[in-house]
C-alpha cells in the first residue's frame, strides 16, 4: 500500500487526476471504477480541464460506478446518476452507452445486481478503481459489519452514513435507507485501486485502513490485501498516521 500525502484538497485532487489520466493515456479503452461523494469532485474537475486542454480523450473509456441509492429516481439531484452527469460526464467526451451506474429503481433488485456484475465481467474487469472512504471506514456502501457481501448487493445504510449524507438532502428523514453497492470482492478484483481522503474527520478511518487489523468492521482495511493500492490523502486526513 502506497500512501501519498498532499498539502491540501486541491493538491490531492490534482495528483489523483494525473494518475487517472496516465491510466487512460496508456490504455485508451480503460475500464474505470468511479466513486461519488464530495471527495472526488475536485479530481473530476481536474480531469474535465485536462480534456478541454486536449490532454486526454475519454471516447473509448468505459466506467462503472460503485453505488446508487435505492428507490431514488435518477433525475433526483441527490442521485449518483445526476451527480456523475453534472460533475463529470457532461464535461468530457465519454459515450453515455459506456457509462454504468446501478439502477436504483430496478423492480427486481437481485437481477439488477447480478446483471451489473456480469457487465463488469464482460468488460474485462476494472483497470483502475477510484474509492472514497467514510468516517466509519466504509467503501462504497459496504458498511462495517460482522460479514460483508462480496458482490453487488442491496444494503441497509447505517445511521452514521445516513447522518453523514443528510447534508445533501433537506433533512435526514429524506435520505434513502437502502442502496445498491458493488461488493468488496468485486472492488478488490480491480487491477489498481486509488483511495482518496480529505479532512480531519477521515483521519481515524485512514489510520485503521493503513495500519489497523484487517477486519470487516473497517471495510477499507481489506485494501491491505490488494497488491496495487495507492492512498492519496491531504495532511488533515493523514494527521493520525
Swiss-Prot record:
GO cellular component: cytoplasm
GO biological process: carbohydrate metabolic process; glucosamine catabolic process; N-acetylglucosamine catabolic process; N-acetylneuraminate catabolic process
Catalytic activity: alpha-D-glucosamine 6-phosphate + H2O = beta-D-fructose 6-phosphate + NH4(+)
UniProt keyword Amino-acid biosynthesis present: no
Pathway: Amino-sugar metabolism; N-acetylneuraminate degradation; D-fructose 6-phosphate from N-acetylneuraminate: step 5/5
Family annotation (CDD domains): GlcN6P_deaminase
InterPro entries for the chain: Glc/Gal-6P_isomerase, Glucosamine6P_isomerase, Glucosamine6P_isomerase_CS, NagB/RpiA_transferase-like
Keywords: Carbohydrate metabolism, Hydrolase
Active-site residues, record numbering mapped to chain: 67, 136, 138, 143
EC class (word): hydrolase
GO molecular function: glucosamine-6-phosphate deaminase activity; identical protein binding
PROSITE patterns xref list: GLC_GALNAC_ISOMERASE (PS01161)
Enzyme Commission (EC) number: 3.5.99.6
Primary role: Catalyzes the reversible isomerization-deamination of glucosamine 6-phosphate (GlcN6P) to form fructose 6-phosphate (Fru6P) and ammonium ion.
Entry-linked HAMAP family: GlcN6P_deamin (MF_01241)
PANTHER family registered for this protein in UniProt: GLUCOSAMINE-6-PHOSPHATE ISOMERASE
Family: Belongs to the glucosamine/galactosamine-6-phosphate isomerase family. NagB subfamily.
The protein, known as: Glucosamine-6-phosphate deaminase
Protein's organism: Halothermothrix orenii (strain H 168 / OCM 544 / DSM 9562)
Amino acid at each position: 500500500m502506497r500512501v501519498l500525502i498532499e498539502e491540501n484538497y486541491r493538491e490531492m485532487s490534482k495528483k489523483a487526476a494525473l494518475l487517472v489520466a496516465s491510466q487512460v493515456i496508456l490504455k485508451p479503452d480503460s475500464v474505470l471504477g468511479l466513486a461519488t461523494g464530495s471527495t472526488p469532485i475536485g479530481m473530476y474537475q481536474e480531469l474535465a480541464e485536462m480534456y478541454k486542454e486536449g490532454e486526454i480523450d475519454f471516447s473509448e473509456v468505459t466506467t462503472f460506478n460503485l453505488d446508487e441509492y435505492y428507490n431514488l429516481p435518477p433525475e433526483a439531484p441527490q442521485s449518483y446518476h445526476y451527480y456523475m452527469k453534472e460533475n463529470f460526464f457532461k464535461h468530457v467526451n465519454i459515450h453515455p452507452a459506456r457509462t454504468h451506474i446501478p439502477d436504483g429503481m430496478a423492480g427486481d433488485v437481485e437481477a439488477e445486481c447480478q446483471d451489473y456484475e456480469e457487465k463488469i465481467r464482460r468488460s474485462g474487469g476494472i483497470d483502475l478503481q477510484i474509492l472514497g472512504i467514510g468516517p466509519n471506514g466504509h467503501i462504497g456502501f459496504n458498511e462495517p459489519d460482522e460479514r460483508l457481501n462480496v458482490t453487488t448487493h442491496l444494503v441497509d445504510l447505517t445511521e452514521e452514513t445516513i447522518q453523514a449524507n443528510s447534508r445533501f438532502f433537506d433533512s435526514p428523514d429524506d435520505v434513502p435507507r437502502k442502496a445498491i453497492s458493488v461488493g468488496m470482492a468485486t472492488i478488490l478484483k480491480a487491477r489498481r485501486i486509488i483511495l482518496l481522503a480529505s479532512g480531519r474527520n477521515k483521519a481515524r478511518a485512514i489510520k485503521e485502513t493503513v495500519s489497523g487489523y484487517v477486519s470487516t468492521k473497517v471495510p477499507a482495511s481489506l485494501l491491505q490485501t490488494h497488491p496495487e493500492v495507492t492512498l492519496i490523502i491531504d495532511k488533515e486526513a493523514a494527521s493520525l498516521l
